[in-house]
């Protein structure tokens, strides 16, 4: 068995795998968030401000010519937040800092200039070290959005009405109206059209007329086509086309009228002449161009040729039929729409992509239209000349030319779903969009605000800045944008994945309802950039994905993945190159599994490699790059599944999603069978404490670790006062997460330990010795047990409960506010009227629960009384009040109590008033938060899962002595049904089982990296040897080891009929805990109008007895039961009160009355102006309200 021992976290693991791997390739997994936000502060804010600078303030000067003041915002600086992260969490504040502008004001007439600092701009929410934001006390994350990159796209679409194909050149800006050029290639309909702003379609040449091509020949010469005069088919097609070759013949002078050359004549007019002089080929106008021109003239130029202005007017009248078309206005509006960089913006990325896309078309244009002689050597030197971020005429003409050639060259079409055509908008860019939107609105009103200012010294720049509008924009973005999400904090992996999520939905993205299958599907360009496995199972499948483990985003937002450079069949392990999806297509790339010799050269002569989006066989000398590691295809979650290569994709998807739902356990264990990525997930989660410098541990307790720094020779480093330099690390203790989980850090070093820089010194939640530990290693057997593990149910041993194997701590927060009411302030007090003494036992003298108290449902946490409306007091009451004080005042109990179904220990109480939180809501005097920690042990109904999508619910908990046991007496801890494996095709769990058993027997931890892990034969051969050493060989076949063993029934001691597969499997407890879901209603609230019980656990509601359930009782003829269901138990108000009395007195139940829903129905019909009257059996009219 070939394994290499490596230290990961603070333990050693035996690594399988043949691919050499460097730790340096694993960058910070949250880098995308941190870098993007840093870029926003460092560059993007100023970038947005500069776009609107300088602001010009016109000044009317008496007697002189008018002058203007120029206001320029030169620089921006930021202040730290006035509250710490923890304060913001506790007090419900936003973690934000102030931004200030430096302003320069210039008098354009005199050149006088003044500068002012510290002009307050706004409060900007800051990102924490963990890559998240704290907004109103809640931790939130901004999800990265995957959007189509701006540029020009050539795509094939089916027409909605005819389902015929159509080729489209689509100009997609970051800001502005769409422009589409359409080419219908279907015979008889071959014509070029243009669609403006997704509205009307026009003849493309009408648009060119508007752009200034007023001469027919000027338009046709843009679309030349060389034809062979010997080709009869081509001749018949192009017979009526205009000749663009400039040929002179003597005979042309004799024509009527005389011609100087063939240029501009029809082909049929000069065909004989060309054949006479044996000319083999001639350039004519493209057939589609001829047809398009003909149709345009037929429709718009019946009498005379249109001018540019008239063409604009014609287009405008169709775009806005309600407005009066004026030629000049039409020209200005349409030109403004596409040729003004302020209204239409491709951005630098878009322009760059257009330059790459149309460069070849531009070279062809120079050769064919401009008649330039360009050799192949010169091609590389020719650059696309257009630099503007708006549309240019050349872009339009080249795109139309490109479209005409697409029919023959179908590879020239773009794939919408290729990652080269998509870019990532991270938090920085999304915040910039919000900032710019608010800032531009604010600047528009600047000249009005400063109108009438005569002196430069009287200009107040602060009056220009409306910081509230910018702060509102940020607040709305963080509070309500689809991309600002409540952080998924179930465990560190869930949090890490949330920060690396890619979403195709959101503003400017796709809509879930309209997203077709193709958009959601896996594409070859996702390799190493986007995980093909991790995505939700519901309506968002394929739209919400995760970044691959090594993917990073470049400055333009394109996803890149790393490769090693290969030259002359030699891999350069020191040369890592990041390639985007577009760049990757141009190279021959070998997979990471290609065998590399000790000297770094490729071993095999021929290697399967990717090139131009396909996989082919290449000689090793042709290989240009090689993948860095086999795991670069997957996300962090998927890379944590051992033997992923043996699992069906659907189950792997479930496995990676369920790991994110694993509850942090009280006693977590790192997996015996890992993949070697556990340390990475722990490192970048933000909860693992690592040593900042080399040092020796000086002091350790549950709340802090002190380390004295050492130099390379292990000598103590000292400061300027000759005191030892010490680092103090504070640990988080029992902090509540967004999902009510417990965040707790535990030291893993002892006093005297020497630690190196970056070494783990304290575990966070779901961690064990510096590695991610989401669950427990459980000794499992695959055998049916009395039907208790039917349909994925799980049988567990009492031993797991005794060991607290799946016990977890959950922290819930309950809060109350003491408000000012119209009748006086509410009061927090222990003096609560009409309450039993025992309910007050846990309260202190102020009426707030004591820390450490054990409370259960109904117990008072905070005593609070609210004043009631007092009627006019009688003289007697006044006398009582004057004698006994205010004891008889009219107050009601509004205390905070523990909700139904919750019990636990109070671990913290926080009390705030207006001094602590100046921004407390108006009318709130005191704000109290009580934290209760609940210990949840394993129970029937809890959901457990492995890492391979193998999930199930606990059906029974057996005594340890009743569990099946091994020949050496070891009992199993869990029994799974063997029928859960074959049809699910997740065989990875069986291999994990065998390797896990080997790990248990040898006390070694293993790592089997995905796509490069242990083979079945390696595991079986070693397991067979070790079993023999431990005398556990019963049931195994030495010639063909199968990993099975003879088990005995714990109840009878008899052996089972067949050997059973046993071993250690890593199991997780998911956050679907039976105790949180189980619920029964006794007496509870009713809805106001229908008077029926509310629904749902939160409202202490009942179970809905719906239409189909009524049918079921009808079918059984259970008339009385049905009657009760629809009256007493539902909405017969009078009836249910009578029943209560009858039950108390032991009498027979009364007859049911009329349900409230009947009365509601009559009221609704009356609301529809229908006169409803009710009569009894004797014909007497009844009053509905009195029934």
UniProtKB/Swiss-Prot annotation:
Signal sequence bounds: none
NCBIfam families linked to this entry: PRK00405.1, rpoB
GO biological process: DNA-templated transcription
UniProt keyword annotation of Nuclease present: no
Entry function: DNA-dependent RNA polymerase catalyzes the transcription of DNA into RNA using the four ribonucleoside triphosphates as substrates.
Keywords for this protein: DNA-directed RNA polymerase, Nucleotidyltransferase, Transcription, Transferase
Protein known as: DNA-directed RNA polymerase subunit beta
Lineage: Bacteria, Thermotogati, Thermotogota, Thermotogae, Petrotogales
GO molecular function: DNA binding; DNA-directed RNA polymerase activity; ribonucleoside binding
Family matches, as InterPro entries: DNA-dir_RNA_pol_bsu_ext_1_sf (IPR042107), DNA-dir_RNA_pol_bsu_external_1 (IPR019462), DNA-dir_RNA_pol_su2 (IPR015712), DNA-dir_RNAP_su2_dom (IPR007120), DNA-dir_RNAP_su2_hyb_sf (IPR037033), RNA_pol_bsu_bac (IPR010243), RNA_pol_bsu_CS (IPR007121), RNA_pol_bsu_protrusion (IPR007644)
Domain of life: Bacteria
Organism: Petrotoga mobilis (strain DSM 10674 / SJ95)
CDD domains: RNA_pol_B_RPB2
